[in-house]
């Protein structure tokens, strides 16, 4: 009997286990059933329908049986404690204005009255923006680029205004080679030189919240396809202007190098690197004693730019010429005086023929001089052909004036009244023999010259 009772007990226990695994669990024994993986994810969208916000949740495992499961949110709500989601096929959705957007909320998966799993989330940090729209690409021929523009509904919204956009484009043949550009505006410029010519490209864009709100990337916008134009410039052709400039530049550089090599030692090196003086000569000049008798002038005139020299000759000549111009008559009178009572001239009278020079005192030419004595009684007057050229000096100027006055005085005492005292001008200049020369100066060029022969014949 004992063995039979034990056998029935084991069989009954196995029957309960088999019935539980096959799904025929009794009511109230649900907690003993095997639990499935109920992990889920949620995202929020703010101001999707006017001022209402939406919260969407879904199971990560698509094979989960969602027949008797519900979602419930509690906390961070306005005026209510909890809210239930409504089921739309495989997702659970709630739209309300009662999200506080500050603080955390508790989202739970419930099977009847029992909570299977829960998550603590903040609605403001799980925001998923709406997908951009109106994506277009315009080719600008003048700028050789493509202007990409798109639009988003968040530009007119109150909360999620700051977004970061991800623009992705690829060649049509490269399926997995996407190129991404991140920007905060809704315009993008693609340069033509970075794209392949005569090719088709696909482009799309998505957004993610920035600034205060955090969250996930939005869905991709609908793709847009555009084609790049063919490049008109052929690679084989070369611009002639650019070629000419390049050749001239190369020739100029070569010419400069040749000139630098040729003129390096003679012209360039002395200017860039001047030769240093010999140290021996420098030390010799430093150690050499200066001369004792230095020629130093303390005259203030030596420090002037223009040196002033004293000239007595010009001053004396001006004085004599001024004196003679005052005393010379317009024309010389020709007169002959003879000794009264005899044919032979008296030594005390002057010669019959008076010799004068044709030059006037206004010029700088030399005066004609006649050799003779101051007294006329024993010295004949020479002809003009043998007269000597006499120069007036500044040193004998005053002496000449004195002799002239003396000679005039002596002559006046011996000459008759017919000889005018101022009809002739006598100039005395010493000659080599130390005798004075008597010269009658006249201003008339037509006056006759008395030669030596006529003078002798008359005697």
From Swiss-Prot:
Record keyword Ubl conjugation present: yes
Gene3D superfamilies: 2.60.40.1870, Immunoglobulins
Residue positions with a glycan: 49, 65, 182
Keyword Phosphoprotein: yes
Motif (WSXWS motif) on chain: 217-221
Pfam families in alphabetical order: FN3_7
Modification comment: N-glycosylated IL-7Ralpha binds IL7 300-fold more tightly than the unglycosylated form.
GO molecular function: interleukin-7 receptor activity
Disulfide feature: 42-57, 74-82, 108-118
Signal sequence interval, chain numbering: 1-20
Cytoplasmic compartment segments: 263-459
Main subcellular localisation: membrane
Location of Phosphothreonine modifications: 282
Domain notes: The WSXWS motif appears to be necessary for proper protein folding and thereby efficient intracellular transport and cell-surface receptor binding. The box 1 motif is required for JAK interaction and/or activation.
Quaternary structure (record): The IL7 receptor is a heterodimer of IL7R and IL2RG. The TSLP receptor is a heterodimer of CRLF2 and IL7R. Interacts with CD53.
Record's function text: Receptor for interleukin-7. Also acts as a receptor for thymic stromal lymphopoietin (TSLP).
Protein name per its UniProtKB record: Interleukin-7 receptor subunit alpha
Protein source organism: Callithrix jacchus (White-tufted-ear marmoset)
Lineage of the species this protein comes from: Eukaryota, Metazoa, Chordata, Craniata, Vertebrata
């Amino acid at each position: 009997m004992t063995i039979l009772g034990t056998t029935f007990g084991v069989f009954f226990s196995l029957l309960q286990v088999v019935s539980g695994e096959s799904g025929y669990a009794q009511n109230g024994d649900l907690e003993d059933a095997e639990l499935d993986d109920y992990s889920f994810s949620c995202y929020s969208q703010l101001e999707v329908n006017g001022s209402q916000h939406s919260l969407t949740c879904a199971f990560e495992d698509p094979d989960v049986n969602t027949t008797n499961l519900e979602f419930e949110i509690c906390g961070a709500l306005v005026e209510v404690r909890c809210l239930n989601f409504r089921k739309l096929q495989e997702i659970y959705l709630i739209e309300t204005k009662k999200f506080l957007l500050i603080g955390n909320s508790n989202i739970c998966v419930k099977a009847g009255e029992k909570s299977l799993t829960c998550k603590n989330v903040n609605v403001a940090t799980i925001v998923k923006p709406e997908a951009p729209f109106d994506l277009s690409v315009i080719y600008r021929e003048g700028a050789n680029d493509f202007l990409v523009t798109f639009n988003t509904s968040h530009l007119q919204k109150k909360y999620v205004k700051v977004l970061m956009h991800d623009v992705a484009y690829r060649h049509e043949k490269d399926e997995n080679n996407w190129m991404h550009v991140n920007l905060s505006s809704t315009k993008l410029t693609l340069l033509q030189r970075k794209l392949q010519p005569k090719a088709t490209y696909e482009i799309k864009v998505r957004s993610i919240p920035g600034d205060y709100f955090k969250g996930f990337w939005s869905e991709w916008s609908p793709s847009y396809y555009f084609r790049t134009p063919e490049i008109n410039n052929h690679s084989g052709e070369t611009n002639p202007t650019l070629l000419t400039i390049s050749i001239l530049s190369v020739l100029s550089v070569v010419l400069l190098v040749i000139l630098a090599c040729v003129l390096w030692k003679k012209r360039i090196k002395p200017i860039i690197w001047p030769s240093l003086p010999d140290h021996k000569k420098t030390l010799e000049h430093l150690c050499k004693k200066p001369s004792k008798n230095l020629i130093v002038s303390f005259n203030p005139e030596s420090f002037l730019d223009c040196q002033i020299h004293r000239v007595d000759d010009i001053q004396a000549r001006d004085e004599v010429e001024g004196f003679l111009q005052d005393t010379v008559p317009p024309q010389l009178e020709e007169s002959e005086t003879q000794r009264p009572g005899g044919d032979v001239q008296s030594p005390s009278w002057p010669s019959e023929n008076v010799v004068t020079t044709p030059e006037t005192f206004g010029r700088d030419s030399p005066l004609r001089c006649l050799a003779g004595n101051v007294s006329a009684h024993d010295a004949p007057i020479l002809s003009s052909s043998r007269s000597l050229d006499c120069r007036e000096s500044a040193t004998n100027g005053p002496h000449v004036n004195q002799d002239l006055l003396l000679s005039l005085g002596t002559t006046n005492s011996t000459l008759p009244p017919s000889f005018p005292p101022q009809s002739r001008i006598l100039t005395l200049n010493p000659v080599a023999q130390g005798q004075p020369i008597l010269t009658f100066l006249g201003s008339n060029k037509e006056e006759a010259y008395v030669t030596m022969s006529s003078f002798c014949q008359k005697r």
